[in-house]
Amino acid sequence: MYTQYPRIEATPLQGVPSPQSGVVPEPQAKPKGPAKSKANGDVGAFIQQCISLCSYLKELETQSHLIHLNYEGSNFLGVHAFLKEQYEAHLEQFDTLAEFIRSMDYMMPMCGCGLKDAAPVMNAVTSYKGADMLGVYYKNLEELGMKAKKLEALAEKVHAIDIQNYMADLVGQAFKAAWMIKATLRNS
């Protein structure tokens, strides 16, 4: 049974100004169905796709970090440093996209379980061979680039130009990293 926490009435302190009420606006009430933009784009579905891409970025961060730790080969030092840059970049990418979602007054999942529920299918690393690990990560980076391209087009439809511009940048980052891995794999 729920017992309400006892409420203690505070008395105002003498000479201490009380904080202004209403300084921070309350979040807007959300309609039950997905919101529509002026161009009749489905903003709610767009945000779900953004959250799905955030989940993908978080998984890429984990994957690149674990490959960074487990990779062995004659080119270890270069690959190790590159993958450190990558997992740090994926964290920054996740954070940036999540902040765009919040700027549109939508919430992110509260834990890893919520992110996993939103996650699209991702290629998993199943071998400790360096070339195999990098090959899987390469495919996932290519997929990241394609997902960001699709989301860029959706962002245009709902007039989210900040996200549209960021998706174009993310496409470039994903394909550049994929190219660098492909060039590394050709020499192994």
Question: Model segments located where?
Answer:
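Short amphipathic alpha-helical segments with heptad-repeat character
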Residues: 44-47, 51-54, 58, 84, ...
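A structural signal for well-ordered alpha-helices, especially hydrophobic packing surfaces
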Residues: 54, 61-64, 68, 94, ...
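Intrinsically disordered regulatory regions flanking bHLH/HLH domains
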Residues: 30-51, 99-109, 113-130
